[in-house]
Swiss-Prot record:
This is 4-hydroxy-3-methylbut-2-en-1-yl diphosphate synthase (flavodoxin). It comes from Pseudomonas putida (strain GB-1). [4Fe-4S] cluster binds at C270, C273, C305, E312. Keywords: 4Fe-4S, Iron, Iron-sulfur, Isoprene biosynthesis, Metal-binding, Oxidoreductase. Coiled coil: none annotated. The lineage of its organism: Bacteria, Pseudomonadati, Pseudomonadota, Gammaproteobacteria, Pseudomonadales. Its cofactor is [4Fe-4S] cluster. The keyword Transmembrane helix does not apply.
Length: 369
């Protein structure tokens, strides 16, 4: 039953992506990106709905051409979550999705083209209250910066970002957020640290092209964990070569581990050993699958023996300690004994009961407040 995070977040300007606040005192928003063909409206909408069910706050959609822009407009009408249009090279695509109701434009002013084209995009965004994300990536730095630095470096990423920030400053546009992504953890972390000291706009965190489900999760957790623990970051996207729904799950798990955001069950479970009095791994796998729909923030401890079990269980909303018989704790106090027969069924029932009680108690607090 952990309290608030001890992390002091960096002060930043608040912007709005649709109805989702980003920056300032807003919760850190979790983003993902579709990997369907945007022209396949049905498939893209279906994937977005799966992301919404997983708890995503903002979804980015690639819009590579005008056909995709028209498809984007149809998609926008069929979903409720804020959508970011990912646009490169052709400024007319940005103008079109602005007309169609996009919630945020992800652009790199450096590849949009001449000053008048950037101004046209910014004017369209300003007129419709649409924020912009300046997205700098180590894999697509400007040629002059590649020549100056020889290779991507944190300083090169920040110089590119500040160049684009100054560009928007000249156009008197402040409704934007910035990212400086790299696939190398140290490069990305240092770039974000440097940039955080120089601008007040919200920062979109990510380790780009992090890898597959396992390797990408580890790299993202290490890199984003370092930054978030320092108070840097206002929205995150976990880039995985995997089902985008996994990006949302990993994002929430990272935030939960730092007590920055709570959604669903926070499991505390031992890796198990020969002391276990029930099959911890099997129990955990079953519980995670069964309770995936539960959104109420709860700490649940599943410990196989009495070495650490009682101590962990006493700190959880619901705790299971292996023994003969096993002992259930509710809100830190011994509540009942369970045998291994129907253990998962009984534990699931108790967790759902505790979740319902918590919802009722929270609602009562709101009414009294």
């Amino acid at each position: 039953m952990h309290g608030e995070s001890p992390i002091k977040r960096r002060e930043s300007r608040k912007i709005w992506v649709g109805n989702v606040p980003v920056g300032g005192d807003a919760p850190i928003a979790v983003q993902s990106m579709t990997n369907t063909d945007t022209n396949d409206v049905a498939a893209t909408v279906a994937q977005i709905q799966r992301l919404v069910d997983a708890g995503v706050d903002i979804v980015r959609v690639s819009v590579p051409d005008m056909d995709a822009a028209e498809a984007f407009g149809k998609i926008k009408q069929l979903v409720s979550v804020p959508l970011v249009a990912d646009i490169h090279f052709d400024y007319k695509i940005a103008l079109r999705v602005a007309e169609l109701g996009v919630d945020c434009l992800r652009i790199n002013p450096g590849n949009i083209g001449r000053e008048d084209r950037v101004r046209a995009v910014v004017d369209a965004a300003r007129d419709r209250g649409i924020p912009i994300r300046i997205g700098v990536n180590a894999g697509s730095l400007e040629k002059d910066l590649q020549k100056k630095y020889g290779e991507p470096t944190p300083a090169a990423l920040v110089e590119s970002a500040l160049r684009h920030v100054e560009h928007l400053d000249r156009l008197d546009f402040q409704d934007f957020k910035v990212s400086v992504k790299a696939s190398d953890v140290f490069m990305a972390v240092e770039a974000y640290r440097l940039l955080a000291k120089q601008i007040v706009q919200p920062l979109h965190l990510g380790i780009t092209e992090a890898g597959g489900l396992r390797s990408g999760t580890v790299k993202s957790a290490v890199g984003l964990g370092m930054l978030l623990a320092e108070g840097i970051g206002d929205t995150i996207r976990i880039s995985l070569a995997a089902d985008p729904v996994e990006e949302v799950k990993v994002g929430y798990d990272i935030l939960k581990s730092l007590h920055l955001r709570s959604r669903g069950i926070n499991f505390i479970a031992c890796p198990s050993c020969s002391r276990q009095n029930f099959d911890v791994v099997k129990t955990m796998n079953e519980l995670e699958g069964r309770l995936e729909d539960l959104l109420v923030p709860l700490d649940v401890a599943v410990i196989g023996c009495v070495v650490n079990g009682p101590g962990e269980a006493k700190e959880a909303h619901v705790g299971l300690t292996g023994g003969t018989p096993n002992l259930i704790y509710i809100d830190g106090k011994p509540a009942q004994k369970l045998t291994n027969d129907n253990l998962v069924d009984e534990l699931e029932k108790l967790i759902r009961q505790k979740a319902a009680e918590k919802v009722e108690a929270d609602a009562a607090l709101i009414v009294r407040g």
